[in-house]
């Protein structure tokens, strides 16, 4: 883009097109103006040269007051999403009011207003943290703006689209304007690996990838790991878990498994012929260390909470298989969070009936990090997700494999 086609605004380092200048002048409404003001401020902070188009977005806003402010600011200003923009979960208000009758009215009101704001903005009301599985699926090489810490690395690494680690507000702003600043992971040289991770640990299942993600995130913090030594191609759920848990202990917006993920077939390609900043080895000992670190209790439990990130159809099938012919112990509540899409299919396949018949609950549209779970504040819980344990701040946390969670729910305790 040449300077002659752009307008440089006073006090800004970015070049903006004439249409972008008109948006900032308020010609397209106050809501769109506020959205672009935020994006320009971000671009200015990161020395972005210009804005680039995005084809879709995912906003991780939730039913909390900080998110409500920005959603209503745009919606009340008449903004509409210009590109498909999906939404993170809030919570199923009628369902939780029925279960926990004393949810504070002000909390429910905030959630209702957030959801209404998205409706007015014309967003996709998916209420799911795994939109890339059904409701909002990017293609390889597509430029997008995704928030949700587990979605960003999945979109960059597994799908091979391009997104920065967006905030809920910046992703929503990009969805409204249809653009994002050109910086960070939208630039090829910034997508090169930073750390070489040599994996010799045995990776048998989803939970091993949970531990791997947790350990790698903690060791690296912020960076782009390149993992070698993984011979078998991870399945979707294993990759989701790796993405999610590497962002509990760290901030991993992208990773490579050369030959397995889509963007680099060799280690050299992943590092763009540069050398790694550091090398990390992951053996069974490191995974055991990560597992031990996540345990703070044993014995009697009050509840089991699964689905952070939202469970897939395959995972719901696994839960149903483990619960078939069994009953949840009296006094223990058993919850599985999932997307509306996955629940519909699970109902058709009979999985929801089995889970509910055993005394469990399958809830949609709901995030672990929401006020609706207040009743569990001082109780002892178990989950298969370190992210869930982190968000809920269990009085005492037990983290284990799915089969261990189901066994504890049936027995009423973890042994």
Spell out what each predicted region is.
Residues 1-10:
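Intrinsic disorder/low-complexity segments
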Residues 9-415:
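Non-transmembrane, aqueous-exposed alpha-helical and coiled segments at domain scale
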């Amino acid at each position: 883009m040449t300077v002659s086609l752009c307008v440089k605004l006073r006090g800004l380092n970015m070049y903006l097109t004439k249409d972008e200048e008109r948006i900032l002048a308020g010609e397209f409404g106050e809501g769109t103006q506020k959205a672009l003001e935020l994006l320009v401020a971000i671009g200015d902070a990161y020395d972005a040269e210009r804005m680039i188009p995005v084809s879709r977005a995912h906003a991780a806003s939730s039913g909390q007051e900080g998110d409500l402010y920005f959603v209503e600011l745009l919606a009340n200003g008449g903004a509409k999403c210009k590109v498909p923009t999906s939404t993170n979960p809030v919570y199923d208000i009628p369902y939780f009011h029925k279960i926990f009758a004393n949810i504070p009215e002000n909390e429910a009101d905030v959630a209702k207003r957030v959801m209404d704001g998205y409706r007015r903005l014309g967003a996709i009301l998916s209420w799911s943290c795994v939109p890339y599985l059904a409701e909002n699926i990017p293609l390889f090489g597509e430029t997008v703006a995704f928030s949700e810490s587990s979605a960003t690395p999945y979109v960059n690494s597994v799908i091979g689209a391009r997104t920065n680690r967006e905030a809920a507000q910046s992703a929503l702003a990009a969805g409204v304007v249809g653009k994002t600043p050109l910086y960070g992971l939208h630039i090829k040289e910034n997508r090169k690996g930073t750390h070489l991770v040599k994996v010799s640990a045995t990776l048998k299942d989803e939970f091993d990838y949970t531990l791997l993600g947790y350990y790698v995130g903690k060791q690296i913090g912020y960076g782009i790991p390149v993992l070698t030594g993984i011979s078998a191609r991870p399945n979707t759920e294993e990759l989701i878990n790796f993405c999610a848990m590497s962002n509990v202990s760290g901030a991993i917006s992208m990773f490579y498994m050369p030959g397995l993920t889509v963007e680099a077939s060799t280690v050299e390609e992943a590092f763009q012929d540069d050398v790694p900043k550091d090398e990390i080895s992951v053996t069974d000992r490191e995974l055991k260390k990560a597992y031990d670190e996540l345990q703070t209790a044993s014995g009697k439990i009050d509840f089991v909470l699964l689905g952070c990130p939202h469970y897939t159809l395959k995972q719901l099938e696994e839960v149903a298989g483990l619960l078939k012919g069994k009953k949840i112990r009296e006094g223990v509540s058993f919850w599985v969070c999932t997307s509306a899409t996955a629940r519909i299919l699970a109902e058709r396949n009979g999985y929801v009936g089995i889970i509910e018949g055993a005394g469990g609950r399958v809830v949609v549209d709901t995030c672990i990090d929401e006020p609706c779970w207040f009743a569990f504040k001082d109780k002892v819980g178990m989950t298969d997700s370190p992210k869930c344990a982190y968000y809920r701040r269990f009085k005492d946390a037990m983290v284990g494999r799915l089969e261990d969670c189901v066994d504890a729910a049936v027995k009423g305790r973890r042994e």
